[in-house]
């Protein structure tokens, strides 16, 4: 395994129980002291830092040295939680990402036993229920459906599903000539709206295919490389070849070479290249129902932020890639991309009430808005993303009808976004038999600690019973799952990934999930997005700078007037600015940034603080945002920050926001993203793309985007004083050595160029769609058994829970 101390121990001993048992024999007094201390804390749950703190307090430092190289300390450091129900202490041990073991120690008798997942979850349930629940409890277990399906075993393989799948299935399917027939049948069946592509009926066998390809290759070798397809299509048809091989002799020859190589010596990389050249994606539907989805005047509204920006940038990049591939294949087909969202009739000042809206900067992408509907008619009010569940089934039926009218065909790919979009995408893909891709953006279970165990406390406001069930259904139904980072899937050595947290959990009184998802599943693929380079570009590119916007940016930052767009003033405009921009909700933690700034006088001396969030002119109806709004005012008053802080209302103009990042660069400032958890961190990418040194949360995607100390800095939002000290250190260094600012700025730009661009993203997404579409056709990747199980979960559990979520009461104005 070779992945650190935990893996070293794993390779030496067979189980956690044996490791603890051996340690008890070798160091009985020390282990008894630790477990007794944990037991004496009484009934409850301990987090990793609490477990280690109790260990350090129980054993003197000199004695701990004896345990340093032993198994016990490794076990404790790998523990993600401890459940204490005297005289028992149970530990959930995670030696490496995606691998878990469970053990329980009877402290009175010094008995150690290993627990199966259901046993551990049943024990954990006693934290909220009196005594063990011996009644029959629904247990969800998806593992049997995947038992015969290949999966990698190394943590480094997580998120590289398509490479693993290609390697495995290539060797399985293409072990002899006869096994190549699925590929032949796939090419023969390939068509668009009844138009035959690739092969016609003249080719019925592999030998006929190879013969035709060789003759075509021979013919192409007599032509100029740029000879258009129209000049050799008659010869191709005679041979049994149709459109799709290439728009010119050179490209057609390259495609034919790939297929001949594949037929001669099957190879996973050749297969991926070949499938990447075949025209497979013409119509795409992207689902994002909740929030205010529009191209202007919506960012900062409730439930409206990075996801909207992500999708708009995504479709522009996808259209470019689809047009390029279709042209290179020699086809005259117009692709279509539909972003399907909710129609909001009363969203004045936005286009959210408009049924169809063309996406700017594209030719064939549209936003299609479909209203929520009940038996009483169209729902006009904005509805929180936590309360959409009772509307989605009817919404899916309405969307299916609207899509059919717009596309006049089934889509080739359906992409879901967030929990609600993923459920609608899942239902549509299931109904239409279409390739289904899931993008979570954020799984709420990881954002609200213990929201599974204590779900009943959250239910009235958040309805997590519906949401977590939806997430399980969508992630298990999807043909492939895209994440922006490894951490989304499997965290890191210390923290649990978003998807990983769904491997095993319990919602007492509802169900136990003993195997919800496998992070080693080859459906997981890391495909990182970028920033829109027409808006976000380096501050040094002076010829592109929008200097005409500087007067209004200066008004925004430095005006001594307070109004509905900006509150509080900056007394010293010569200081650098630390800047943050996000939705005003608890998880984004902008109030935490204000507090750490308020507590550090030296930081106030060095820099001004500018936060962009909320709307001073239009109070939110979202309860969480209301609470954060009040907290922000209270903190500014408590720390007497007027003169040091500028609080600007959410800014809807992305073009001006791009120049705002660059203007902050001119002040030699920095961007701070202080979220408790951030799935990806699009604002982090935007800031770095503009050259703005960035400090971002260590929890989630930014930890991967930023290389600490090279292209930015990681901060711990739970340790505000340490974060503010890091900021002070940075700005002190910049004062003493101005080149330090430029060094970090340049490091950020280099990091973006290497890994985070939309061009790389769209190329990968199109290839993934082709590869998964092919394997779905030629193998049991369709996972029919899983889908029957999901139908039952949806029909018997989800629908009942969704029906308990209150419907919106019409009559009140439905503004933000």
Curated annotation (Swiss-Prot):
InterPro entries: Glyco_trans_1 (IPR001296), Sucrose_synth_GT-B1 (IPR000368), Sucrose_synthase_pln/cyn (IPR012820), SUS_EPBD (IPR056736), SUS_N (IPR056735). It is an enzyme of class 2 (transferase). SUPFAM superfamilies: UDP-Glycosyltransferase/glycogen phosphorylase. It comes from the Eukaryota. One of its GO terms (biological process) is sucrose metabolic process. Keywords: Glycosyltransferase, Phosphoprotein, Transferase. NCBIfam families: sucr_synth. The modification Phosphoserine is found at residue 15. PANTHER family: PTHR45839, SUCROSE SYNTHASE 1. Sucrose-cleaving enzyme that provides UDP-glucose and fructose for various metabolic pathways. One of its GO terms (molecular function) is sucrose synthase activity. This is Sucrose synthase 2. Belongs to the glycosyltransferase 1 family. Plant sucrose synthase subfamily. Residues 280-757 are annotated as: GT-B glycosyltransferase. Its EC number is 2.4.1.13. The keyword Cell cycle does not apply. It catalyses: an NDP-alpha-D-glucose + D-fructose = a ribonucleoside 5'-diphosphate + sucrose + H(+).
């Amino acid at each position: 395994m070779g992945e650190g101390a935990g893996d070293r121990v794993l390779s030496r001993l067979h189980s956690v129980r044996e490791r603890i048992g051996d340690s008890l024999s070798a160091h009985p007094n020390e282990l008894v002291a630790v477990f007794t201390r944990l037991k004496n804390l009484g009934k409850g749950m301990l987090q990793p830092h609490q477990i280690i703190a109790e260990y350090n307090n129980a054993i003197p430092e000199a004695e701990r040295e004896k345990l340093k190289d032993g198994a016990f300390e490794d076990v404790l450091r790998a523990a993600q939680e401890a459940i204490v129900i005297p005289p028992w202490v149970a530990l959930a041990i995670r030696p490496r990402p995606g691998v878990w073991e469970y053990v329980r120690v009877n402290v009175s008798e010094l008995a150690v036993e290993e627990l199966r997942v259901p046993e551990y979850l049943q024990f954990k349930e006693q934290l909220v229920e009196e005594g063990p629940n011996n009644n029959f409890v629904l247990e969800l277990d998806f593992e049997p459906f995947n038992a015969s399906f290949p999966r990698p075993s190394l943590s480094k393989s997580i998120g590289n599903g398509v490479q693993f799948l290609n390697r495995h299935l290539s060797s399985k399917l293409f072990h002899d000539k006869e096994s190549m027939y699925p590929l032949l049948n796939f090419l023969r069946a390939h068509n668009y709206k009844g138009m035959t592509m690739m092969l016609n009926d003249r080719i019925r066998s592999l030998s006929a295919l190879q013969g035709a390809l060789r003759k075509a290759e021979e013919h192409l070798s007599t032509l100029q490389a740029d000879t258009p397809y129209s000049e050799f299509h008659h010869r191709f048809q005679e041979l049994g070849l149709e459109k799709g091989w290439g728009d010119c002799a050179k490209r057609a020859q390259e495609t034919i070479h790939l297929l001949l190589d594949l037929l001669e010596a099957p190879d996973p990389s050749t297969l991926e290249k070949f499938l990447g050249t075949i025209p497979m994606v013409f119509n795409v539907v992207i689902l994002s129902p909740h929030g205010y989805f529009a191209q202007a005047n919506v960012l900062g509204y409730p439930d409206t932020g990075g996801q909207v920006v992500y999708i708009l940038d995504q479709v522009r990049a996808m259209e470019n890639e689809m047009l390029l591939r279709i042209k290179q294949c020699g086809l005259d087909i117009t692709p279509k991309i539909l972003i399907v969202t909710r129609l909001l009739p009363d969203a004045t000042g936005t286009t959210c009430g408009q049924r169809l809206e063309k996406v700017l900067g594209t030719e064939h992408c549209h936003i299609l808005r479909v209203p929520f509907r009940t038996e009483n008619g169209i729902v006009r009010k904005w509805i929180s993303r936590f309360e959409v569940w009772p509307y989605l089934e009817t919404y899916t039926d309405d969307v299916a009808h609207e899509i059919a009218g717009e596309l006049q065909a089934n889509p080739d790919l359906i992409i879901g976004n967030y929990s609600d979009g993923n459920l609608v995408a899942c239902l549509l893909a299931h109904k239409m038999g279409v390739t289904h891709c899931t993008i979570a953006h954020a799984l709420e279970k990881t954002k609200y600690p213990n929201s599974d165990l204590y779900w009943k406390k959250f239910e009235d406001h958040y309805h997590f019973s519906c949401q977590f069930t939806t997430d399980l259904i969508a992630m298990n139904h999807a043909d492939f799952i895209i994440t922006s980072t490894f951490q989304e899937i499997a965290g890191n050595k210390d923290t649990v990934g978003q998807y990983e947290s769904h491997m095993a959990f319990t919602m007492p009184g509802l169900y136990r999930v003993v195997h919800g998802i496998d992070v080693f599943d080859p459906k997981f693929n890391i495909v990182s997005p970028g920033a829109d380079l027409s808006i976000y570009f380096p501050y040094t590119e002076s010829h592109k700078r929008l200097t005409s916007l500087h007067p209004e940016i200066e008004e925004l930052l430095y005006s001594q007037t307070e109004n509905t767009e900006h509150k509080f003033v900056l007394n010293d405009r010569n200081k650098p600015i630390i800047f943050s921009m996000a939705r005003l909700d608890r998880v984004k933690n902008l109030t935490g940034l204000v507090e750490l700034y308020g507590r550090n006088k030296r930081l106030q001396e060095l820099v001004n603080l500018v936060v962009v969030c909320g709307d001073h002119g239009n109070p939110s109806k979202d309860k969480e945002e209301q609470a954060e709004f009040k907290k922000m005012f209270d903190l500014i008053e408590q720390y007497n920050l007027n003169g040091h802080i500028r609080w600007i209302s959410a800014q809807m103009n992305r073009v001006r926001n791009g120049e705002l990042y660059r203007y902050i660069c001119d002040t030699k400032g920095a961007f701070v993203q202080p979220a408790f958890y951030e799935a990806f961190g699009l604002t982090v990418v935007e800031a770095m793309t503009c050259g703005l040194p960035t400090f971002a949360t260590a929890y989630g995607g930014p930890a991967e985007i930023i290389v600490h100390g090279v292209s930015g800095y990681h901060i711990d939002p739970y340790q505000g004083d340490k974060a503010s000290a890091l900021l002070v250190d940075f700005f002190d260094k910049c004062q003493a050595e101005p080149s330090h600012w430029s060094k970090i700025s340049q490091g950020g730009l280099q990091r973006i160029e290497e890994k985070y661009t939309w061009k790389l993203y769209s190329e990968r997404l199109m290839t993934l769609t082709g590869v998964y579409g092919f394997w779905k056709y030629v193998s049991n990747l369709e996972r029919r058994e899983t889908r029957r199980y999901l139908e039952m979960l949806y029909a018997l559990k989800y629908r009942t829970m969704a029906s308990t979520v209150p419907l919106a009461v019409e009559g009140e104005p439905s503004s933000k």
